[in-house]
Amino acid sequence: MAQPIGRKPEWLKIKMASGASFAATRQLLNRHSLHTVCRSALCPNLQECWSRGTATFLLLGNTCTRSCTFCAVSKASAPPAPDSDEPQKIAEAIASMKLKHAVLTSVTRDDLPDGGANHWIATMQAIRQRTPNVSLECLIPDFQHKKAALDSVMQATPDVLNHNIESVPSLYSTVRPQANYRASLELLRYAKEQHGLATKSGLMVGMGEERHEVEATLHDLAAHGCDMVTIGQYLQPSAAHLPVARYVPPQEFEEYSTIAKNAGIRYVHAAPFVRSSYHAETFPNNLTITQNL
């Protein structure tokens, strides 16, 4: 049974890390003036990931046009224009970091006619020109479900197409008011059926959902062809954000993993600190999944 809300339980204590690799990663990102979801979203795994010489690149600036109540990324209705040099900067950073698997994500840019799709494509092209052997995992927004934008990004053939479902449908009006649960599921199905992409999604628990709702969402993801799923504990970024409803014990994450696999999801990473891109490079057969569709 979950502990009552109060002090964080032992399993949620972060082990701090630093060292030369951490400093080198930070310096490289600062030198190229790049945003990362690690820093912008206050990810609890920042120290660990940067110490391993990896990071998740945040495209289209660090200001989002949506107001998800769980997210620490800055919000505004009219963010600054995207940096046209960002694709090349990211490509250079990936080459410098010698990454074999790079993870890209972005803020949602409802203010742009294409939602930032062309910027996404330019970034993927720049990376592949600079480091053609790197595999690309793209955690995309919904682009307001505009078919032209989705098709253009999917036709750029990311090795893994990630789109987070984030939560159960009953909480959407609270945690993700400008998104649509069913439409996000359809996006994943479309990526699989129409573009033959390996698909991935993630959700957080501890936001007020019921266990049976998590199980139903995992079955929904499986039914829409999702290959990979991440499940992690929601942690409140600040007092201004959605409060944590409960701390989910590690055993429950193991149970969710079993449920997801039994539903037909091919790979599951479920644990308190798991986030969408956490150890993404270790997901087995990232490329084989695509090749064996």
UniProtKB/Swiss-Prot annotation:
GO terms for cellular component: cytoplasm. Its EC number is 2.8.1.8. Its cofactor is [4Fe-4S] cluster. Pfam families: Radical_SAM. GO terms for molecular function: 4 iron, 4 sulfur cluster binding; lipoate synthase activity; metal ion binding. Residues 50-266 form the Radical SAM core domain. PROSITE patterns: RADICAL_SAM. Its main location: cytoplasm. This is Lipoyl synthase. It comes from Chlorobium chlorochromatii (strain CaD3). The gene is lipA.
